[in-house]
């Protein structure tokens, strides 16, 4: 990241100056009260949040849900396939919603039919199955399916259905469609008797926001513009899912044959409901094989006799539609009209925000003149006719190298800015804009990169980008908070400090947590630095911690430290320095409850999954979803202590009475349930109502404590390194990836020095050594001599125990959480990112090899660590443990 004095390229573009310089009139807001009032009244849950993923889904207003719930509470809606009074009400209401949808798109039941589906993807699949394809024969070439390469995966996936019908698929590049010569209607020839073809293209690219001409619909259908040189009649499917969320669509003018949509893109609620708008002139040609409930006029169970219903909608809506969700659409339309005045107002408002952000973002420069971002677009954001409220980009460093989108996403999360990263289910546009060849896509797959993961750079080349998008409730403050975030993390002021971000309570600032701010962390067993490395006046910050536990002596873990007891710092001081090249264990930590506070020990037994009872429990919400400090930072204030003699875990927290949980389940009483950790299914059991009530009281919401079942074996998902054989696959507790995490004090010391240089002279040190160690939540701490030397290790030996190094840990934003208070500070992540050249790696994962548990095995503070280096070892990045 660049430093140095402020310069014009680091300034935030004033909105007033932008409006004055615009060549066209721009509209911001809706002219009926302030947008801030609308946000406060309808979207109060967005306080402190910058939501910029409206292309993924927009957000619903509070009044929409309130109105819908009132409707449900006042009316009885029965199954529309029945004939009773409540069912008749449902049927009539659903039909009114169909009319409302058609009116929204400026058409009528005479021209179009609304077929409800589960979403636009299901609508596309329906078209692929029902279109009247003609297979090639001896007398003709048959139908063809053409699609713009800048299309969603769900469009491209239609080719698998057409291929089964022996129908050819032809991808068409946007530039080829743009340059296709227009013909007059006479030159196009008579399509009578020729096979039908289908051309699919998006009204708006979900990757870049490019808006393709709606005039293509009429030109292709009339034969004046051909996607491919095939004789026959052309039909057009307009993928409007991304477009209609922020723009009006007039089907009386642009009469596409098929228009798939998803309603959550427009209203935010309901999800799981979409529609296919079918031009009635084509409806009679559609074919259907399967028939479900409600679609038959008559059929025989014992003979192949079936007559479909006459209504196109009833013929294709198999089974009972999601009628309550359909009824919810009425309240969505009402809210949208009431709050904004209509889609044209939304189009103007969202485009103004996008054009401003694009202008400001593209003007940012490093002191050497290099751009801060690379924007992927086919337009100059000159008009909403050619560009939607979407900006796809990658952040660059001052040498022009791409900063991985995963890192940008993590940094944005620290500021509570919600963006989308990757290729957005649009590989064609991703390849085109990023210059990724077909061969590179296959190579990336072989390297382990799949759609939707966080592998953002391969050989320095980006595999995707960052996307921001605006919705009707987006504000100027959202746009400016995002721009300030880019400026603050990429450009610096004259003092070397980041430019100011939003203040608490303002858009873009993390929400204030008064409970966390006022919480005083109780004494807990944690690590401390060795004397030669931490000589600051704050080195005794944890001197009130209880003594670290010796598993052999089984010191009672709940005893507070006294003058006669040896403190953690004193025990660390007993570790011999030895040769400069030697490494010893200075601290051992286990984390009995995933994402909760550490429990420090002096000597501890090993189990088949790592340190005994390390991450054997986890806290889940009322839906059984595992919680981490990313969602609930105050988890770090929950302090577990393991008492091996009494076979219990004692849990403490500030303001709460200690509570005990048995280490093992009662097999006769326990009820096994299933949960997930990093997409892995795990068998667990609930630890009971008593601890659940305790947790719920502390956090103020219903939580449960669950433990991994002792007879359930969970294997690591993949092998790491070249030489690891299948029989060495590790068994895991509730960790994400590996059994152990090791960090090196020299690496911590370098990070500490970097953070110290950011402080003004004489300012109190913000990051003592112990504070930093606790943030990385490692099991094994060593006193290495060189920063990050552990990443070069292949194996280590600790006494008779051997451990394989699986690779570096790729860190997430959890390292920004102070483990004593639960408060966030993004400096740690940012500085580590600078030091590690865009990849936030810290610590290495270990797996024990050939562990014989027939006799007890222990790790101890003071044990010598002997690393083994191997040249040309490959290690893949592994996500952080929690």
From Swiss-Prot:
Biological or metabolic pathway of the protein: Cofactor biosynthesis; molybdopterin biosynthesis
InterPro entries: Aminotrans_V_dom (IPR000192), MoCF_Sase_C (IPR005302), MoCo_sulfurase (IPR028886), MOCOS_middle (IPR005303), PyrdxlP-dep_Trfase (IPR015424), PyrdxlP-dep_Trfase_major (IPR015421), Pyrv_Knase-like_insert_dom_sf (IPR011037)
Any one biological process term the GO annotation gives: Mo-molybdopterin cofactor biosynthetic process
Active site: 425
Region (Disordered): 496-546
GO molecular function: lyase activity; molybdenum cofactor sulfurtransferase activity; molybdenum ion binding; pyridoxal phosphate binding
Residue numbers carrying Phosphoserine: 528, 530
Polar residues bias: start-end ranges: 527-546
Tissue: Ubiquitously expressed.
Sequence ranges assigned to domain MOSC in this UniProt record: 707-868
PROSITE patterns reported for this sequence: MOSC
Transit peptide listed as a keyword: no
Keywords: Molybdenum cofactor biosynthesis, Phosphoprotein, Pyridoxal phosphate, Transferase
Cofactor(s) it depends on: pyridoxal 5'-phosphate
Annotated positions of the N6-(pyridoxal phosphate)lysine modification: 265
Catalytic activity reported: Mo-molybdopterin + L-cysteine + AH2 = thio-Mo-molybdopterin + L-alanine + A + H2O
Purpose: Sulfurates the molybdenum cofactor. Sulfation of molybdenum is essential for xanthine dehydrogenase (XDH) and aldehyde oxidase (ADO) enzymes in which molybdenum cofactor is liganded by 1 oxygen and 1 sulfur atom in active form.
Illness association: Defects in MOCOS are the cause of xanthinuria type II (XU-II). XU-II is characterized by excretion of very large amounts of xanthine in the urine and a tendency to form xanthine stones. Uric acid is strikingly diminished in serum and urine. In addition, cows suffering of XU-II cannot metabolize allopurinol into oxypurinol due to the lack of ADO activity.
Protein name (database record): Molybdenum cofactor sulfurase
Source species: Bos taurus
Name of the gene encoding the protein in the UniProt record: MOCOS
């Amino acid at each position: 990241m660049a430093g140095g004095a402020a310069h014009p390229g680091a300034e935030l573009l004033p909105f007033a100056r932008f409006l004055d310089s615009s060549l066209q009139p721009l509209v911001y807001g809706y002219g009926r009260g302030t947008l801030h009032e609308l946000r406060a009244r309808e979207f109060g849950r967005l306080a402190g949040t910058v939501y910029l993923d409206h292309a993924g889904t927009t957000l619903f207003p509070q009044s929409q849900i309130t109105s819908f719930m009132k409707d449900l509470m006042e009316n009885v809606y029965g199954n529309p396939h029945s004939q009773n009074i409540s069912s008749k009400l449902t049927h009539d209401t659903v039909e009114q919603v169909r009319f409302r949808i058609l009116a929204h798109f400026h058409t009528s039941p005479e021209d179009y039919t609304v077929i409800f589906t589960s979403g636009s993807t299901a609508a596309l699949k329906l078209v692929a199955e029902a279109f009247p394809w003609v297979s090639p024969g001896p007398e003709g070439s048959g139908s063809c399916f053409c699609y713009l390469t800048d299309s969603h995966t769900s469009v491209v996936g239609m080719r698998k259905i057409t291929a089964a019908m022996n129908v050819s698929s032809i991808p068409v590049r946007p530039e080829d469609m743009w340059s296709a010569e227009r013909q007059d209607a006479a030159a196009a020839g008579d399509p009578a008797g020729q096979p039908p073809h289908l051309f699919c293209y998006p009204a708006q690219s979900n990757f870049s926001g490019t808006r393709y001409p709606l005039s293509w619909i009429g030109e292709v259908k009339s034969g004046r513009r051909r996607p491919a040189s095939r004789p026959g009649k052309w039909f057009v499917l307009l993928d409007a899912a991304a477009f209609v969320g922020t723009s009006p669509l007039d089907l009386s003018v642009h009469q596409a044959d098929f228009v798939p949509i998803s309603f959550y893109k427009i209203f935010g609620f309901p999800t799981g409901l979409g529609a296919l708008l079918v031009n009635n002139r084509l409806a009679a040609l559609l074919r259907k094989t399967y028939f479900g409930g409600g679609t038959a006029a008559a059929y025989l169970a014992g003979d192949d006799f079936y007559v479909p219903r006459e209504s196109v909608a009833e013929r294709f809506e198999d089974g009972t539609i999601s009628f309550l969700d359909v009824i919810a659409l009425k309240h969505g339309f009402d809210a949208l009209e009431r709050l904004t005045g209509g889609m044209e107002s939304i189009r103007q408002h969202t485009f103004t925000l996008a054009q401003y952000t694009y202008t400001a973002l593209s003007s940012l420069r490093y002191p050497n003149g290099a751009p801060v971002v690379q924007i992927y677009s086919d337009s100059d954001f000159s008009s909403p006719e050619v560009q939607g409220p979407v900006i796809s980009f990658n952040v660059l460093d001052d040498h022009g190298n791409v900063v991985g989108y995963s890192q940008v996403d993590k940094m944005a999360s620290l500021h509570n800015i919600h963006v989308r990263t990757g290729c957005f289910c649009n590989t064609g546009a991703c390849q085109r804009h990023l210059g990724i060849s077909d061969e590179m896509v296959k190579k990336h797959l072989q390297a382990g990169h799949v759609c939707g993961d966080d592998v953002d750079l391969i050989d320095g080349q980006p595999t995707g980008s960052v996307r921001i998008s605006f919705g009707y409730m987006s504000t100027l403050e959202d746009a400016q908070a995002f721009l300030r975030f880019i400026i603050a993390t990429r450009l610096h002021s004259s003092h070397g400090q980041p430019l100011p971000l939003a203040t608490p309570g303002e858009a873009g600032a993390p929400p204030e947590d008064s409970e966390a701010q006022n919480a005083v962390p109780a004494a807990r067993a944690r690590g401390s630095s060795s004397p030669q490395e931490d000589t600051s006046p704050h080195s005794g910050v944890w001197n009130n911690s209880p003594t670290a536990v010796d598993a052999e002596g089984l010191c009672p873990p709940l005893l507070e430290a006294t003058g006669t007891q040896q403190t953690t710092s004193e025990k660390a001081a007993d570790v011999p320095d030895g040769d400069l090249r030697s490494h010893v264990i200075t601290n051992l930590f286990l984390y009995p409850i995933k994402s909760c506070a550490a429990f420090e020990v002096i000597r501890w037994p090993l189990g088949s999954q790592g340190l005994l009872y390390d991450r054997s429990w986890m806290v889940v919400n009322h839906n059984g979803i595992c919680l981490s400090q990313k969602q609930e930072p105050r988890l770090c204030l929950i302090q577990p202590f393991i008492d091996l003699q009494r076979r219990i875990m004692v849990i403490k927290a500030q303001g709460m009475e200690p509570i005990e949980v048995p280490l093992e389940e009662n097999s006769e009483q326990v009820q096994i349930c299933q949960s997930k950790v990093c997409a892995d299914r795990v068998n667990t059991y609930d630890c009971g109502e008593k601890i659940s009530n305790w947790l719920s009281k502390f956090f103020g919401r219903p939580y449960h404590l669950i433990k991994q079942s002792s007879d359930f074996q969970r294997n690591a998902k993949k092998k790491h390194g070249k030489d690891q054989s299948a029989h060495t696959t590790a068994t895991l507790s509730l960790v994400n990836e590996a059994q152990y995490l090791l960090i090196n004090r020299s690496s911590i010391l370098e990070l500490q020095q970097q953070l110290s240089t950011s402080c003004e002279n004489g300012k109190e040190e913000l990051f003592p050594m112990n504070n930093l160690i606790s943030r990385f939540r490692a099991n094994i701490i060593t006193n290495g001599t060189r920063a990050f030397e552990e990443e070069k290790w292949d194996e280590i030996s600790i006494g008779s125990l051997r451990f394989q190094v699986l690779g570096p840990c790729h860190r997430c934003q959890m390292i920004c959480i102070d483990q004593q208070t639960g408060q966030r500070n993004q400096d740690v992540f940012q500085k580590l990112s600078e030091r590690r050249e865009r990849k936030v790696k810290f610590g290495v994962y270990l797996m024990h090899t050939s562990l014989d548990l027939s006799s007890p095995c222990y790790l101890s503070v003071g044990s010598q660590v002997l690393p083994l280096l191997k040249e040309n070892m490959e290690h893949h990045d592994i996500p952080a443990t929690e």
